[in-house]
Amino acid sequence: MTDDTTNSGGAPIVFDDWRTISFAVFLALVGYSVMVTVPVLSTALVHSLSFSAEQVGRVWGNDMLGFSVGAIIAALSVASVNRRHLVLGGIVFSMGANALCMYMVDYESMMWLRFAAGIGSGIFTGTAVATLGGTTNPVRAFNILLLGFSFSAAGELHLFPQLSLNGIYWFLIGSAAVCGLFIRWLPSRPLNQEEKELQHELEDRSEDWNVPVILPIFCLVAVCFTYINIGGYFTYIELAALDEGISPDWVTPLLTWASFLALVGCLLALVCARFGLFRPLFVALLSMAVLVGMLSGGITNVNLAISLFAFMALWTFADVYQSSMMGYMDRSGSLVALLPSVQGFGQFVGPNIAASIIGNGLGYSIMFLVSGSMALVAMVIYGGIFFYMHTRKSVSLTGDTEAA
């Protein structure tokens, strides 16, 4: 389509147009709304529908499973299907499921409806992430996304406790509907070969990102483990704090203010870019494991604040590096579009593991230890990728020296 090959915004690559990036960021933020507000949504289900803590974990875990499935659909389709049609289909599906949640409130129905709503969100979020990954500078694009994430998460965490459960559903429906108004800002197809060659001339060359397809797949596995950690921690942090006797008047504002630390994570990512993508990521994942695990010894006002504030900063910090790494390794966008899928799958597995631990009477302490250990698994996987890439670079340099 000719409107996708030319760019009136002045950028040589259509994916670098400010309108494309702005819309993709907004689309992704709408899709991630449930993921970033799970603590508040969990409490809303307990108070409004009298669901148990275990049921809450399974309901929102099902939403994230649907989110994962939707992103897989996007990944299989973004290279061949008109992306605008794909996004519109996801928006309609998500809006319909959220609307039905207001009328079908029993546990079994809620499980299926949250799964369906997740599918719709996953489809348009996966397409948005693939679009950001297709920019010439994915680090900048994902930093913009996560800067927006810090403000949208703070706003939603502040607003949602003031709304009824149906009010939250109306908010999700309305924000998805707004996305449809700007659909023409989204390129309908990926770059052609000529555009890819131009983009290759413009992109960062600090690493050799021409890697076997298995490496971005390993990256996706690592992202999944990172989000198993996030899912277990973030779903139950508010309920665990309340169970320990922490005042709701302390916990709720803390969640809101902690979300602004996502901004700090983005700024740190910019500062640390000089150290490459791998080393800062290792530090972030190790720190996340410690911050989650330390709550296993008991929750106080002080360690809750430290854990939440630092965790939110490191969440976005790690996401910038994980997403950018995928963007450089996979220019087609098919694997990048799977990022929301593995994030959602991790957010499905994490709450369900946590729910099983709590359901078996092992308590929140064991849950925090298990969740924190998942970040260490991700760190080991990235360590293997780093070792392969830099061993390959050393072998290549040695070969060039001998040839000379």
Identify the residue ranges that each predicted region occupies.
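Extracytoplasmic gate region of multi-pass secondary transporters
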Residues: 38-39, 214-256, 260-263
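Conserved MFS/SLC helix-loop-helix module at the cytosolic interface between two early adjacent transmembrane helices
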Residues: 69-105
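Helix-to-loop junctions at the C-terminal end of transmembrane segments
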Residues: 70-83, 264-277, 358-359
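Cytoplasmic helix-loop-helix junction between adjacent transmembrane helices
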Residues: 113-147
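Intracellular juxtamembrane helix-capping segments at the cytosolic ends
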Residues: 123-136, 316-330
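Helix-loop-helix hairpin linking two adjacent transmembrane segments in secondary transporters
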Residues: 143-191
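C-terminal transmembrane helical hairpin of 12-TM major facilitator-type secondary transporters
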Residues: 276-322
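A late C-terminal transmembrane helix in Major Facilitator Superfamily
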Residues: 329-364, 371
